A protein has these predicted regions:
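Flexible "arm" and connector segments at domain edges
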Residues: 1-163
Length: 163
């Protein structure tokens, strides 16, 4: 599983960044991406509380997609910026509600403007724990999200990408 992640995640990150650049999303102010991140966090919590595993898996991947683009926006295209902390794990699994609570806290920090890498590292680690709890790895969740968005058409309207 780790071997596949080592091969697949850098490719997925590159595809998502290219997708963002083709659509001009990478040039939008990163502050606007925060709203998309919040939307995806909301979908994650909604899926969890409804017990909708398909939407939960999709939400995990969608969050990572929005974070990849967020990092792309505030890092000014610096390559491998996201990949550097993809492999960070924190602690062991402490229970689903613990990791969801940690994501809720991180959501507030991101919304408040904390773009620091440490926040994103913890979000990724918590997302990994949640995915693992359900028998998935986070890379396959991102792959699932990529398959959903890769052919989407849309445009930037008033600084926001709409599809």
């Amino acid at each position: 599983m780790i071997t596949n992640e080592l091969k697949e995640m850098p490719l997925l990150i590159a595809k998502i960044e290219e997708w963002s650049m083709v659509r001009g999303i990478h040039n939008l102010p990163y502050e606007t991406q925060r709203y998309k991140i919040m939307e995806e966090f909301g979908e994650l919590f909604g899926a969890y509380y409804r017990g909708n595993l398909e939407l939960l898996k999709d939400s995990l991947g969608d969050i990572v997609v929005t974070l990849i683009i967020y990092v792309q926006q505030f890092s000014n295209g610096e390559r491998n910026f996201f990949e550097e902390f993809w492999w960070v794990d924190k602690d062991e699994f402490k229970g689903l509600s613990y990791h969801l609570d940690q994501i809720a806290t991180s959501t507030n920090l991101i919304y408040a403007g904390a773009s620091g890498i440490w926040v994103l590292r913890y979000v990724i680690a918590d997302l990994k724990h949640i995915a693992k709890h359900y028998g998935w790895n986070l890379t396959e969740c991102v792959e699932h999200a990529w398959e959903e968005i890769k052919d989407r058409k849309g445009r930037v309207v008033d600084g926001v990408w709409v599809h």
